[in-house]
């Protein structure tokens, strides 16, 4: 196996109850769209994100009102909370005091060394990690002057400069991101960064666009980076409801076999042989399995030609055939059901498989 497939030598960093890096699975993040000082709205949005599989959530902290709301938000959510800080070191101190699980800063734009040191000492005292967020669109003047324009080399140099600031203060609970809206630039930057240091990498294609175009752009960029074995946590950035970010992120990870707690749908392309309402059924099943946290592969096939043989790798599935459905497990037909009830029958089988998975998981955990 190519040594680049799995980057397991990253330094493990604790973020709340999650470990980022090491040999741990990638985690999915998002960011709220609400005004952080509006606690009710922010908590409600985070709860929606939790329901669809968000594992870490970031909130903007642009002012004191936002910083003062962090403690109340933290108490009412169930996933690690990250505060996004720019320029004002006092907001970082307030966020740390409020009990956030991570802060995102650029040490270089916080101010004088004594201010950075105050933030680092506060984070160190509470075991709170710091994410260094490098962005191609906001590189330091000295980097742009040196390279002429945003380059992968410049982004990595910026990251290393910020890392050195923290390391000089004996701080090593660091996560790094190197985001760009240019997919090729992001891929190159993350590849170079993965070879330059062993801190965990937070992946993202920034300013990727709307739900449709941005989802495709993010999948293309993140997929290329993941195929190199790079990445420990990620966010799909969309101009859309953040719930959609989680949906895209989950599908990207599932496509690479990097998510052990998500169901996957296989459905055949439409053609003249289809004998059931495939599009409606596939969408209904996809919505049904969206919140199932078990690694079940589900197939929905439009005719007997494509199934069940061509989807034998699926755990469970249906294939339409003349007003009825062939229900199958691992390529073997288990029974025929009328088309009118075949989706409900499929859902029952999915629930059975999920329950079996959770029972086995519980048994294994009890043996540890």
From Swiss-Prot:
Keyword Iron appears in the UniProt entry: yes
Cofactor: how and how many bound: Binds 1 [4Fe-4S] cluster.
Enzyme Commission identifier(s): 1.17.7.3
Coiled-coil annotated residue ranges, if any: none
Enzymatic reactions: (2E)-4-hydroxy-3-methylbut-2-enyl diphosphate + oxidized [flavodoxin] + H2O + 2 H(+) = 2-C-methyl-D-erythritol 2,4-cyclic diphosphate + reduced [flavodoxin]
Any one Gene Ontology BP term: isopentenyl diphosphate biosynthetic process, methylerythritol 4-phosphate pathway
Domain of life of the native organism: Bacteria
Sequence positions that bind [4Fe-4S] cluster: 268, 271, 303, 310
Keyword Metal-binding attributed: yes
InterPro entries in alphabetical order: Dihydropteroate_synth-like_sf, IspG_bac, IspG_bac-typ, NO2/SO3_Rdtase_4Fe4S_sf
Entry keyword set: 4Fe-4S, Iron, Iron-sulfur, Isoprene biosynthesis, Metal-binding, Oxidoreductase
Pathway(s) per entry: Isoprenoid biosynthesis; isopentenyl diphosphate biosynthesis via DXP pathway; isopentenyl diphosphate from 1-deoxy-D-xylulose 5-phosphate: step 5/6
MF terms (GO), sorted A to Z: 4 iron, 4 sulfur cluster binding; 4-hydroxy-3-methylbut-2-en-1-yl diphosphate synthase activity (ferredoxin); 4-hydroxy-3-methylbut-2-enyl-diphosphate synthase activity (flavodoxin); iron ion binding
Cofactor dependency: [4Fe-4S] cluster
Function, as annotated: Converts 2C-methyl-D-erythritol 2,4-cyclodiphosphate (ME-2,4cPP) into 1-hydroxy-2-methyl-2-(E)-butenyl 4-diphosphate.
Family, as annotated: Belongs to the IspG family.
Name of this chain's protein: 4-hydroxy-3-methylbut-2-en-1-yl diphosphate synthase (flavodoxin)
Organism taxonomic ancestry: Bacteria, Bacillati, Bacillota, Bacilli, Bacillales
């Amino acid at each position: 196996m190519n040594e680049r497939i799995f980057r397991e030598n990253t330094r493990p960093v604790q973020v709340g109850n999650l470990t980022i890096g090491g040999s741990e699975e990638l985690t999915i993040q998002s960011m709220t769209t609400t005004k952080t000082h509006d606690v009710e709205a922010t908590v409600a949005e985070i709860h929606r994100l939790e329901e669809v599989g968000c594992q870490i959530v970031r909130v903007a902290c642009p002012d004191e009102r936002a910083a003062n709301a962090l403690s109340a938000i933290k108490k009412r959510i169930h996933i690690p909370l990250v505060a996004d800080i720019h320029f004002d070191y006092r907001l970082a101190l307030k966020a740390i005091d409020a009990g956030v699980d991570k802060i995102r800063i650029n040490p270089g734009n916080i101010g004088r060394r004594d201010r950075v040191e105050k933030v680092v000492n506060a984070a160190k005292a509470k075991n709170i990690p710091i994410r260094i967020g490098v962005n191609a669109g906001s590189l330091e003047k000295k980097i742009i002057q040196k390279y002429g324009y945003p380059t992968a080399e410049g982004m990595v140099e910026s990251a290393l400069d910020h890392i050195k600031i923290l390391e000089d203060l004996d701080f090593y609970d660091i996560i790094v991101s190197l985001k760009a809206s240019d997919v090729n630039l992001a891929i190159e930057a993350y590849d170079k960064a993965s070879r330059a240091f062993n801190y965990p990498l937070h992946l993202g294609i920034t300013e990727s666009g709307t739900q449709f175009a941005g989802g495709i752009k993010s999948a293309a960029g993140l997929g290329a980076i993941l195929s190199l074995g790079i990445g420990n946590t990620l966010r799909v950035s969309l101009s859309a409801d953040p719930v959609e970010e989680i949906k895209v992120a989950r599908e990207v990870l599932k496509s690479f076999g990097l998510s052990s707690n998500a169901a996957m749908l296989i459905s055949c392309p439409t053609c003249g042989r289809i004998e059931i309402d495939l599009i409606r059924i596939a969408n209904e099943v996809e919505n049904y399995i969206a919140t199932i946290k078990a690694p079940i592969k589900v197939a929905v096939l439009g005719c007997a030609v494509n199934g069940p043989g061509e989807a034998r790798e699926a755990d469970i599935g249906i294939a339409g055939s003349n007003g009825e459905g062939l229900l199958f497990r691992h390529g073997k037909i288990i029974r025929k059901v009328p088309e009118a009830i075949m989706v409900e029958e499929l859902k029952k089988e999915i629930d059975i498989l999920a329950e079996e998975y959770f029972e086995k998981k519980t048994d294994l955990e009890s043996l540890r």
